[in-house]
């Protein structure tokens, strides 16, 4: 048996070495056939002797058993997006702001890889968890799929615990091979490598993900306490030394002129790369200066992403159709002859409003120039006048709503036409779609087509009806089998424990966006407190103006809305902000004013349910264990947070002890 163990160890060493040489250094020392031979030898040993298979065995690269779903996991620290720059003027403003704050600065310029942002967690040198970015606060656990990417080390040679972040992507060669295989099987090809990478990492069967030949570039460290770096460039160098793959085209520069030179170089050379990039990232290099500059709610102040100019193409405008939004705004949409733009086929594009159509003299039948705003949303820029046909048709907006026939109005100071019928079906359906969206209640599986069917079948008339749905309501719907229905009902049940700000945003109160929902929920803590708020009190909150304050108060004073809230409460939908200030709640003395961390897998409730219950007791629930943490509630496989709590001497409870205390309090 000792001979088997030594051979397994040797195979691990050789396979990890060859994988690193091929996928990270791009300099293989042996042919593929040698790697395959050794891998199959290890697979045979593990098949005959399962006790020799480890979590970090090179054989996990080929994928394992299929999962039923991806678990949602909170990030230890948010994965923020970057602010955007679209031209030299934007970059010079960024540079001036930086220098006004911290004086002289060195920048690190890096290629912006066009893929899927991921977070990789290592404990004692072993890769233990990988998450998608998700909404920045909560991502999906795609660990098994990420293990199939050879550029991600399953373990490193040092016993460190840390988190790194980067971009998973599909090399152009892999993309071509994948689409050729899809074409041969008469399957729909992927539009671009980014979509292919995202689709591959969301495969429930990791064996399928393994076949897609993805790669990754790491670009940041989440916590520098385990690193010796003082700068971004030193951090990337240290990641190189640990065996991670970082992009080697990075460059340190001293001036904004050097930044522009770097951008110009890669604007011209981007098509020569073996992977797609969609811009350049500019970061303040010194970590101390990064800390001084800090963050906004959405992004770091010390970094910016320059986006390459959008590709423009010409196609024919076939027709103009109207869509009705959840607030009644009527938006004209161009129906186009399908055309490829920035890697995807576009057949529809926004025309924004009637004034834009007339100001730009855009007519049905014209050849029009379209581009993707921010490389995402297609829009019509202008008509090509010298190609205009004689029968090009001037477009006139209708006087009545195409959904409910109610008269359309233009509110003073607005350019959009609006349907003000509160019973307009199109608005109601759009409101339901908004309620379940990712930044609102985030109900997986409840898409547009299902909502439309449920509305047409009179199973849902308002957002509260969603929480009253049964298996009998869902099974008759198109393409809804037993498993899909169970998953959807579980997602609906899970949404009940969402935080107050998600509910507020989901209700679709006019002028109330994600950020304002967060700020207002944090300020008032519960929906019942908001029922008593005045416009003046709301306007005391930073960034809340008169229009928003008036809209919120008017909405919550409506008796129909109060009845809707009661209907939601009857189904135990949470009405409390997850981080509600303990001073505003009576709470329970065992938890009031205490800082508590939940870690590991809970079986008798979800993390959100536990967090909301603790908030009701006056506790502050956080993600990180520090010396100031009062209590850690540890479920199964608690990991590094439990170890840190033991190190600090923090009080630790099991899930069973926590549930027992809940039962005592609730009688």
UniProtKB/Swiss-Prot annotation:
Keyword Cytoplasm in annotation: no
One function term, GO molecular function aspect: DNA binding
Keyword vocabulary terms for this entry: DNA damage, DNA repair, DNA replication, Ligase, Magnesium, Manganese, Metal-binding, NAD, Zinc
Family per record: Belongs to the NAD-dependent DNA ligase family. LigA subfamily.
Protein name: DNA ligase
BRCT domain residues: 586-667
NCBIfam families the UniProt entry points to: dnlj, PRK07956.1
InterPro entries hit by this protein: BRCT_dom, BRCT_dom_sf, DisA/LigA_HHH, DNA_ligase, DNA_ligase_AS, DNA_ligase_CS, DNAligase_adenylation, DNAligase_N
Protein source organism: Staphylococcus saprophyticus subsp. saprophyticus (strain ATCC 15305 / DSM 20229 / NCIMB 8711 / NCTC 7292 / S-41)
Annotated NAD(+) binding sites: 32-36, 81-82, 110, 133, 167, 283, 307
EC number: 6.5.1.2
PROSITE patterns xrefs: BRCT, DNA_LIGASE_N1, DNA_LIGASE_N2
Cellular component annotations (GO), alphabetically ordered: cytosol
